[in-house]
Curated annotation (Swiss-Prot):
<feature type="binding site">
    <location>
        <begin position="143"/>
        <end position="146"/>
    </location>
    <ligand>
        <name>ITP</name>
    </ligand>
</feature>
<feature type="binding site">
    <location>
        <begin position="9"/>
        <end position="14"/>
    </location>
    <ligand>
        <name>ITP</name>
    </ligand>
</feature>
<dbReference type="GO" id="GO:0036222">
    <property type="term" value="F:XTP diphosphatase activity"/>
</dbReference>
<dbReference type="GO" id="GO:0046872">
    <property type="term" value="F:metal ion binding"/>
</dbReference>
<keyword id="KW-0378">Hydrolase</keyword>
<dbReference type="GO" id="GO:0036220">
    <property type="term" value="F:ITP diphosphatase activity"/>
</dbReference>
<comment type="function">
    <text>Pyrophosphatase that hydrolyzes non-canonical purine nucleotides such as inosine triphosphate (ITP), deoxyinosine triphosphate (dITP) or xanthosine 5'-triphosphate (XTP) to their respective monophosphate derivatives. The enzyme does not distinguish between the deoxy- and ribose forms. Probably excludes non-canonical purines from RNA and DNA precursor pools, thus preventing their incorporation into RNA and DNA and avoiding chromosomal lesions.</text>
</comment>
<dbReference type="InterPro" id="IPR027502">
    <property type="entry name" value="ITPase"/>
</dbReference>
<dbReference type="GO" id="GO:0005737">
    <property type="term" value="C:cytoplasm"/>
</dbReference>
<keyword id="KW-0547">Nucleotide-binding</keyword>
<dbReference type="GO" id="GO:0009117">
    <property type="term" value="P:nucleotide metabolic process"/>
</dbReference>
<dbReference type="GO" id="GO:0009204">
    <property type="term" value="P:deoxyribonucleoside triphosphate catabolic process"/>
</dbReference>
<comment type="subunit">
    <text>Homodimer.</text>
</comment>
<feature type="binding site">
    <location>
        <begin position="67"/>
        <end position="68"/>
    </location>
    <ligand>
        <name>ITP</name>
    </ligand>
</feature>
<keyword id="KW-0963">Cytoplasm</keyword>
<dbReference type="InterPro" id="IPR029001">
    <property type="entry name" value="ITPase-like_fam"/>
</dbReference>
<feature type="binding site">
    <location>
        <position position="166"/>
    </location>
    <ligand>
        <name>ITP</name>
    </ligand>
</feature>
Length: 188
């Protein structure tokens, strides 16, 4: 029997969303594991690789970590991988206000999943990107910066969209599609 993958998260909403997107036919079992990993600085791919290797070392087995960025084009990619800290300090209104002096309200949501089959194994990255705009906070406020991100082609923020719709278009959906394809192919 294949060993379950430890999915490093302490966020129940994220776990729920990941399981909903992967669906019941995903060929591996995901077990949530809460680890206090170091908050690294740098570029998203490097951050994800390092976090994944540290998690694999601690778990001593297959591990999956996720990192999300929200990149404001007017701010040359900031807050980027530091979105968690910006959101914690500024809340959605403050994030929106960061762009007050800028005409360009466009942004890119980036989700990167990093998988390592074990300690000292090569890390595989699965990345999804969604273009959109930063809007005044609208909708439910129970999931991070969803109230301020409006994906291109939609007139609603992530928070205003039905979960099923968001889970068909989001940056996380795009990354998880790649991850699912990898594991389905590996299972054949």
């Amino acid at each position: 029997m294949t060993r379950p993958i430890s999915f490093v998260t302490g966020n129940a909403k994220k776990l729920e969303e990941v399981r909903a997107i992967l669906g019941p036919k995903f060929p591996r079992e995901l077990l949530p594991v809460k680890l206090d990993l170091p908050e690294l600085q740098g570029e998203i791919d490097d951050i994800c690789r390092k976090k994944c290797l540290e998690a694999a070392r601690r778990v001593k087995g297959p591990v999956l970590v996720e990192d999300t960025c929200l990149c404001f084009n007017a701010l040359k990619g900031l807050p980027g991988p530091y979105i968690k800290w910006f959101l914690e300090k500024l809340e959605p209104e403050g994030l929106h206000k960061l762009l007050d002096g800028w005409e360009d309200k466009s942004a890119e949501a980036v989700c990167t999943f990093a998988y390592a089959p074990g300690e000292d194994a090569e890390v595989i990255l699965f990345q999804g990107r969604t273009q959109g705009d930063i809007v005044y906070p609208r909708g439910c406020r129970d999931f991070g910066w969803d109230p301020i991100f409006q994906p291109k082609g939609y007139d609603k923020s992530y928070a205003e969209l039905p979960k099923e719709k968001k889970n068909e278009i989001s940056h996380r959906f795009r990354a998880l599609n790649k991850l699912r394809d990898y594991f389905v192919a590996e299972n054949q």
